[in-house]
A protein has these predicted regions:
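Hydrophobic "lid"/C-terminal helical patch
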Residues: 27, 247-251, 274-277, 323-330
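Residue-level signal for the nucleotide or nucleotide-sugar donor/cofactor binding architecture
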Residues: 106, 114-117, 167-171, 207-210, ...
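Glycine/proline-rich active-site loop of Rossmann-fold NAD(P)-dependent oxidoreductases
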Residues: 146, 174, 190, 199-213, ...
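Hydrophobic alpha-helix immediately C-terminal to the catalytic Tyr-X-X-X-Lys motif of short-chain
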Residues: 175, 179, 183, 215, ...
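C-terminal "lid/loop" region of Rossmann-like NAD(P)-dependent oxidoreductases
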Residues: 230-232, 257-260, 269-275, 282-299, ...
Length: 348
């Protein structure tokens, strides 16, 4: 197993790719309590406003860069304060990947690159610095649930149509996991794969086709909440703070722990969530049903036995509390969203 011999002068140096995105910005925020944080993002599908409040901290540095390309940290003078040339990097969280249902077709190649080129680029960085490496994969690697199998465990191989409309993302995540595991086998890297299930909370992109924020926006505007499917469709929802706890706990484990499901194992009917949001926003919106869209995919729930036993992790935030926080954020930031007319409400 590769182990870094570089001295840690004050705090460990941690890279977060996709750090200006939804998950990444919350992760950077939490890591600042214990580390020097190098946030890397090309802002192609994220928002600098997510990390505006972090730019003031001396232990935080934002670098606009496309990690699909090889990266030489020595070329960035702004990282001299972290003594990267001498201390190196201790941890890499690789989160960068476009996930925009609204712009899914336009971002297909970006998704392909994120699950291939950027994997090699960031894994090569981990080899150079002998850094621990965590990749955020997705529940899509399991394929769709069946009547016989609703909850997925880490040993389930899954069935994914690699030539489907979603193949660049779904099969892309499977290939990305293969990259991670291959680097472990060849270089002895201490690598982690988090299979992330549906996650929600403040800083999700608004008007981008994501279920919870679009439901909230439509509810506060008294517009119809459109469910693409039937009233019995179910999803699990994990609040962002719980997900960040899980990622941090996973990174803290030794090389014996390399793969885990993170998400909520409690499912709700989409119609129930829509009804909750209508009531919580005192909305006059109606729930309507339409045929599923071409990129829609049913998703199962995670079996969390490994997360509970190996990480001591379970999601703690109640759905009602998480939705309230997300509603408050959405109302506060609604005016910052440019209104370009209606577009379909999709599911990630």
């Amino acid at each position: 197993m590769l182990e870094s011999s570089n001295p840690i002068f004050e705090k460990k140096n941690v890279i977060v790719t996709g750090g200006a995105g939804f998950l990444g910005s919350h992760l950077c925020e939490r890591l600042l309590q214990e580390a020097d944080v190098i946030c890397i993002d090309n802002l192609s599908n994220s928002n600098i406003q997510n990390i505006d409040h972090l730019l003031q901290y001396p232990d935080f540095e934002f670098i606009k860069y496309d990690v699909n390309k090889p990266m030489d940290l020595d070329q960035f003078e702004e990282l001299d304060k972290f003594k990267v040339k001498f201390q190196g990097v201790q941890e890499i969280y690789h989160l960068a990947c476009p996930t925009s249902p609204k712009n899914f077709e336009q971002l297909k190649l970006n998704s392909l690159w994120a699950n291939s080129s950027s994997m090699i680029s960031t894994l090569d960085l981990a080899v150079k610095y002998k850094a621990k490496y965590l990749f955020t994969s997705s529940s899509v690697v399991y394929g769709e649930p069946t009547e016989q199998r609703i909850a997925f465990s880490e040993n389930d191989e899954g069935i994914v149509n690699h030539l489907s409309t979603r193949g660049c993302y779904n099969e892309g995540k499977r290939f990305a996991e293969t990259c991670v595991e291959t680097y472990r086998q060849v270089y002895g890297l201490d690598v982690k794969i988090a299979r992330v299930f549906n996650t929600y909370g403040p800083r999700m992109k608004l008007r981008d086709g994501l279920l919870i924020p679009d439901f909230i926006l439509n509810a506060i505007e008294d517009k119809d909440l459109v469910i693409y499917g039937d009233a019995d469709m179910e999803f699990s929802f994990c609040y962002i703070s719980d997900m960040i706890d899980g990622l941090l706990k996973l990174m803290q484990t030794g090389p014996e722990m390399s793969l885990v499901n993170l998400g909520s194992d409690q499912v709700y009917k989409i119609s129930e969530v829509a009804d909750m949001l209508i009531k919580m926003t005192n909305s006059s919106s109606k729930i309507v049903y339409e045929a599923p869209l071409s990129i829609f995919m049913h998703k199962g729930k995670p079996n969390l036995q490994r997360a509970k036993e190996m990480l001591g992790w379970i999601p703690l935030v109640r759905l009602s509390d998480g939705l309230r926080n997300t509603i408050d954020y959405t109302i506060a930031n609604k005016g910052m969203v440019e209104m370009n007319g209606d577009h379909p409400r999709l599911y990630r």
